[in-house]
Regions:
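Non-catalytic protein-protein interaction scaffold segments in large eukaryotic complex-forming proteins
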Residues: 2-58
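Residues that flank catalytic or metal-binding motifs in active/ligand-binding sites
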Residues: 19, 84, 130, 158, ...
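Long, charge-dense tracts
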Residues: 48-93
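An exposed tryptophan-centered "aromatic clamp" motif
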Residues: 75-79, 84-101, 215-240
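Extended acidic/polar, glycine-enriched regions
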Residues: 120-156
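Extracellular/periplasmic catalytic domains that process cell-envelope and extracellular macromolecules
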Residues: 125-127, 172-177
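Conserved hydrophobic ligand-interaction patch in extracellular adhesion modules
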Residues: 180-240
Length: 240
């Protein structure tokens, strides 16, 4: 992933005569967006232009010179669920010097906090580093997991374009930003293993629907099971 660079002139005189030395300072840039890296290598790995098994997704909306908001729809994630999170891997700036405002759109909130990342799936060389962690919150049905006929829950308005801005904690100046477009929202049923018909009825009662194969990324087309973990789905058209 290429990054932009700042060139500053150093006006110090040297013995050979008057000369300005160029000091190349990397500008703050988001290099990768890291979800859970389990099942992200070998036969599960994505295209090299999109995915690094040790770092996560490459940012698609940035080139050598600038950020392109019109390409936010190519960035990760495009789907979300309550309490899911991912990390922004940023270079060229002290993460602890950044502050982020939460963004709420269509009933979904993206909140960024600076955390020390020690998740078990993070490579050893990256553990303990401070990262900007993005958590999504929105409609969920935790208090109705055990109810076979739950009450309807809120439906987010999709799609929504989120732009997260990291600002200097002292000056409030914009330092770095990241954008993505959420097109789908999932609601899960925890550890409840039920038949397809039971899960279908549960989802429909919520006002959602069961996802189809084409709604899921990387899903095999030939799974066979008598009982399923509940996961309901709403797409950008609100379709059921």
């Amino acid at each position: 992933m290429s990054s932009s660079w700042n060139v500053q002139a150093n006006g110090k005189k040297v013995r050979a005569g008057n000369r300005s030395d160029a000091i190349i300072i990397p500008s703050p840039v988001i290099n990768y967006v890291r979800p859970n890296l389990n099942f992200g290598d070998d036969e599960y790995a994505g295209q090299a232009s999109l995915w690094n098994p040790d770092k996560g997704f490459l940012v698609q909306s940035i080139d050598f010179e600038s950020i392109h908001p019109e390409l936010y729809n190519l960035n990760f994630p495009t789907t979300g669920m309550h309490n899911l999170y991912f990390d922004l891997l940023i270079t060229g700036v002290n993460i602890n010097k950044l502050t982020w405002e939460p963004v709420t759109l269509g009933g979904i909130t993206a909140t960024v906090t600076n955390v020390v990342a020690n998740d078990r799936w993070i490579p050893d060389e990256d553990k303990g580093q401070v990262v900007a962690r993005v958590k999504l919150t929105g409609p969920e049905a935790r208090n109705q997991w055990y109810n076979p006929h739950p009450n309807p829950i809120a439906k987010p308005r999709l799609p929504q374009t989120f732009e997260l801005v990291g600002r200097d904690i002292s000056t409030a100046d914009e330092v770095v930003k990241y954008g993505f477009v959420l097109k789908q929202w999932f609601v899960n049923r925890g550890d409840q293993l039920k038949t397809y018909s039971d899960q279908l009825a549960w989802c429909n009662s919520l006002g959602y629907r069961m996802p189809r194969i084409r709604d899921l990324t990387g899903m095999a087309t030939h799974f066979q099971t008598k009982k399923l973990r509940g996961k309901c789905f709403l797409n950008s058209t609100g379709g059921k």
